[in-house]
């Protein structure tokens, strides 16, 4: 890990050596109010600060400023107005304890004159954020004279890192916490358990880490797709393991305590996620009696009909709560298969006893019970939006990832929500042309798209719903991210867009933000982070940047094979609206098909036309199970009844290719009114995505 001083040494040495107007300063997130004043303040060597903080609050602050900024502080009852650097806390201890959930208690005022810097806030958290702004203002030991008043928009400004699919060391986690603090992010969602490996020491259940914290292959995809995939015992327990391709690790309880304290010193709350009842392959491997079948490798769900499952989860959660003081405990709740529950005698008995109509209600029953346990222990349940299926537990908070509607629905019903919709907030998706970028997981989310996302739609601004939207979070799933450099490349700078969304009420627009990102990215690189350089961005797929002019534009389309409703794009007008898709399948221009018919559509040209060329593009994205068709057939007809095949193409693309856009092209001359395009799938469960049928391109 880069030592703690790296931020002081690198972040404080931002690129410019002369003072620029404040509007050009690279402050991220943009402050609420900033006024330029005459002059500059010099950070002289040996500068010391004074503060009225005392006790543990003073100790934490002084340790941080000494280590990171090389500025020690003294604690005094009434900081002198003559002191060159003053931090003044005006609030109470009770307010300090409430600050993490209150935007007003996180605010600060920063006043810089040629002779003094004063930061005033009601809480230590607010003072800390004032220091981060001060650090971003400093250039070449000079700070421009300014007056800033600043308060965040949302109390929850988060980042999630998946540590199950690939394990990240304590130092690597701390490094990201440092950057989070610098950009005023305050929630770290720690995804600790999943099928890729269990990462937290649980003293009552040692087999979780002894048997499933390591696996026999570092490449998650290769390992996961094996029919006989194997976990590996802790290599420290093996007589001979050198040379074996063992990947993994886990955090001891001492590791976790250290990281929790490290985060707290930066005013970051860590929210642990313990997946249940799905995504539990590793649990039922170590303790197969907790599955419906009693056998490992037969399911990924816990048996929610067995009492011992609840005993196990409650015992695990007791140890979790001893380590993490967070209000919320995240229980996952997403993507449970529920397959074995349908035939499991224990699950069926519970369904009968509690009059549950389906397995979705059975999962809801499980979630309600876990929530009662957490509530009885003074905590609250947070889960992915699948916990809304069945009936939502009464006090649960929802993390909305499958779009925005689930979150808005939960908020309307009075539940607190964290917005993390995958199309905007999943940082493991491609951020530029997928054919030139490192391997990523589905989708395409460029910086501008992430920046433009607003957790509260315009229609709901100023309504009572706003108070239930706690904030926004970026998420990094690491199935295809093995190395720290790759992890950081995916996180930065898109996380900076979410930092600004979470903090700044009146944003200045993407063009201004992009300029600030360039400076911030350079600073990140000097500090040892492998950030994506937005100056090298290729941008949107060229074909998507303008309307395609062709004779089929606006013509009616008959669907003999229906598109999937969740990938409907613009419905029946999609394939002749002149709009080609971007690099990603989620942005509303690509239409998805998965039924047995595949793509089978007829374009009515309105009259018999000389058809000279027909084009269509098909996406191939391996990890999203979107494949180029097995066959593409072009047919024509004058009457719409009798069709003649004029072309049949077998693309011959290897399904092992990560990403490509296959261009189907036909040229010739045929008179017809109806143009029919058919495309069959390579595999029964594979998707076909296409965006436009271009006829007689102009």
Identify the meaning behind each predicted range.
Residues 1-26:
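Bacterial Sec-dependent N-terminal signal peptides
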Residues 24-156, 486, 497-532, 536:
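Contiguous, structured surface segment used for ligand recognition
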Residues 26, 101-301, 305-310, 316-328, ...:
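Feature activates predominantly on carbohydrate-active enzymes
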Residues 167-169, 195-201, 277-283, 330, ...:
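Flexible loop/turn segments at secondary-structure boundaries
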Residues 197, 583-650, 658-698:
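Aromatic, loop-rich ligand-recognition surfaces of beta-strand-rich domains
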Residues 283, 289-293, 297-394, 401-408:
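Active-site neighborhood of glycoside hydrolase catalytic domains
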Residues 381-386, 391-396, 402-547:
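Flexible, acidic glycine-rich loops studded with aromatic residues
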Residues 546-582:
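Predominantly extracellular/luminal regions of secreted and cell-surface proteins
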């Amino acid at each position: 890990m880069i030592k703690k001083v790296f931020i002081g040494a690198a972040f404080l040495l931002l690129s410019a050596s002369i003072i620029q107007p404040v509007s050009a300063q690279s402050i991220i997130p943009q402050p609420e109010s900033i006024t330029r004043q005459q002059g500059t303040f010099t950070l002289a060597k040996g500068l010391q600060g004074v503060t009225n903080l005392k006790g543990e609050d003073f100790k934490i602050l002084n340790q941080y400023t000494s280590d990171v900024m090389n500025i020690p502080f003294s604690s005094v009852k009434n900081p002198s107005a003559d002191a060159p650097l003053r931090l003044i806390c005006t609030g109470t201890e009770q307010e300090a304890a409430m600050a993490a959930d209150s935007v007003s208690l996180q605010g600060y005022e920063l006043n810089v004159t040629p002779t003094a810097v004063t930061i005033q806030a009601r809480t230590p958290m607010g003072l800390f954020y004032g220091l981060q702004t001060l650090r971003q203002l400093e250039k070449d030991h000079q700070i421009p004279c300014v007056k800033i008043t600043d308060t965040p928009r949302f109390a929850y400004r988060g980042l999630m890192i998946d540590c199950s699919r690939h394990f990240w060391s304590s130092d690597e986690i701390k490094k990201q916490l440092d950057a989070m603090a610098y950009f005023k992010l305050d929630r770290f969602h720690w995804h600790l358990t999943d099928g890729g490996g269990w990462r937290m020491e649980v003293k009552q259940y040692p087999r979780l880490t002894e048997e499933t914290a390591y696996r026999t292959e570092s490449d998650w995809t290769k390992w996961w797709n094996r029919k006989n995939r194997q976990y590996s015992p802790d290599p420290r327990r093996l007589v001979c393991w050198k040379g074996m391709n063992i990947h993994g690790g886990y955090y001891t309880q001492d590791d976790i305590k250290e990281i929790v304290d490290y985060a707290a010193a930066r005013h970051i709350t860590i929210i642990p996620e313990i997946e249940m009842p799905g995504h539990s392959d590793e649990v039922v491997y170590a303790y197969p009696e907790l599955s419906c079948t009693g056998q490992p490798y037969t399911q990924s769900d816990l048996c929610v009909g067995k009492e011992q499952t609840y005993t196990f989860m409650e015992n695990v959660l007791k140890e979790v709560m001893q380590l993490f003081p967070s209000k919320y405990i995240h229980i996952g709740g997403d993507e449970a298969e529920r397959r074995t529950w349908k035939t499991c005698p224990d699950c069926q008995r519970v369904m009968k006893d509690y009059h549950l109509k389906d397995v979705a209600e059975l999962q809801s029953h499980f979630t309600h019970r876990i929530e009662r346990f957490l509530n009885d222990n003074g905590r609250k349940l947070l889960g992915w939006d699948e916990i809304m299926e069945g009936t939502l537990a009464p006090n649960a908070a929802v993390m909305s990832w499958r779009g925005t509607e689930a979150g808005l629905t939960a908020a309307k019903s009075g539940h607190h929500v964290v917005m993390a919709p995958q199309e905007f907030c999943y940082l493991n998706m491609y951020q530029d042309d997928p054919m030139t970028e490192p391997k990523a997981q589905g989708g395409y989310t460029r910086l501008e798209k992430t920046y433009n996302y607003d957790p509260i739609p315009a229609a709901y601004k100023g309504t009572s719903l706003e108070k239930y939207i706690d904030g926004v979070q970026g998420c990094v799933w690491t199935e295809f991210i093995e190395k720290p450099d790759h992890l950081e490349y995916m996180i930065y700078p898109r996380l900076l867009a979410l930092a600004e969304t979470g903090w700044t009420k009146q944003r200045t627009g993407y063009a201004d933000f992009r300029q600030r990102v360039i400076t911030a990215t350079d600073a990140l690189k000097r500090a040892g982070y492998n950030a994506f350089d937005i100056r090298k961005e290729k941008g949107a797929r060229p074909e998507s940047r303008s309307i395609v002019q062709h004779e089929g534009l606006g013509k009616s389309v008959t669907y003999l094979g229906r598109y999937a409703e969740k990938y409907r794009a613009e419905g029946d007008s999609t394939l002749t609206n002149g709009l080609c898709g971007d690099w990603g399948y989620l942005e509303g221009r690509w239409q998805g098909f998965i039924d047995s018919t595949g793509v089978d559509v007829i374009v009515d040209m309105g009259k018999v036309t000389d058809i000279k060329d027909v084009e269509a593009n098909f996406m191939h994205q391996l990890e999203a199970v979107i494949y180029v068709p097995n066959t593409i057939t072009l047919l024509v007809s004058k009457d719409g009844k009798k069709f003649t095949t004029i072309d049949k193409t077998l693309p011959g693309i290897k399904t092992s290719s990560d990403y490509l856009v296959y261009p189907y092209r036909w040229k010739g001359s045929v008179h017809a009114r109806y143009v029919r395009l058919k495309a069959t799938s390579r595999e029964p469960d594979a998707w076909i995505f296409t965006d436009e049928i271009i006829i007689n391109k102009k």
